[in-house]
């Protein structure tokens, strides 16, 4: 997940330094239901990149927020790219958790240190028996989404005004605005698990 690369403006005047919040949630809600019992993020941006439209530093606290979004969405692990910023090469200006001297923490690296300290406290308070409250479970929604359909609709648009992802996100964002638990599912799932099912442009 590379959320700060100049490809979106986010929300507010500094939103371009945090990314679009629904992209995080949608990814969690999609992959949590697609890859089995364990999912996580293999590459999370720890600082500025070198290949974006423009390459700002993430807003202070953004890396920490992204990590917590992954865990809150059911993820079990977060890896980042990269550990150390290289001294030369094509990604010389791509930040890591450690700066080029091999010792100094980058701003994102400092946030990772803080996260690991906080995780130890959270783990101590974790209750394995806790379940989703009934009031929330009653709002559980299945949102049908299929990558093959997505690619087909994007490849052969009926009009240049059509964009599949923003259309799907209109529904997703509305559901999230009233705190509905959403599972992004395929047609192979058991629909009986969901009181509500939405199939935007399916």
Segment roles from a protein language model:
Residues 3-202:
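Carbohydrate-binding surfaces of carbohydrate-active enzymes
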């Amino acid at each position: 997940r590379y959320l700060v690369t100049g490809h979106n403006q986010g929300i507010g005047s500094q939103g371009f330094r945090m990314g679009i919040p629904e992209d995080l949630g949608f990814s969690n809600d999609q992959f949590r239901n697609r890859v089995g019992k364990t999912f996580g993020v293999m590459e999370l941006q720890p600082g500025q990149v070198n290949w974006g439209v423009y390459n700002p530093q993430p807003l202070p606290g953004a890396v920490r927020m992204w990590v917590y979004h992954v865990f809150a969405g059911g993820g079990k692990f977060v890896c980042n790219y990269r550990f150390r910023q290289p001294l030369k090469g094509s990604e010389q200006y791509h930040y890591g958790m450690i700066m080029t001297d091999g010792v100094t923490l980058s701003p994102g690296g400092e946030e990772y240190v803080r996260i690991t300290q906080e995780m130890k406290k959270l783990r101590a308070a974790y209750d394995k028996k806790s379940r989703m409250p009934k009031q929330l479970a009653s709002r559980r929604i299945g949102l049908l989404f299929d990558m093959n359909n997505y690619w087909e609709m994007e490849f052969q648009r009926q009009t240049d005004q059509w964009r599949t992802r923003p259309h799907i996100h209109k529904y997703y964002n509305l559901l999230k605005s009233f705190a509905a638990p959403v599972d992004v599912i395929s047609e192979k799932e058991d629909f009986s698990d969901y009181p509500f099912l939405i199939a935007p442009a399916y």
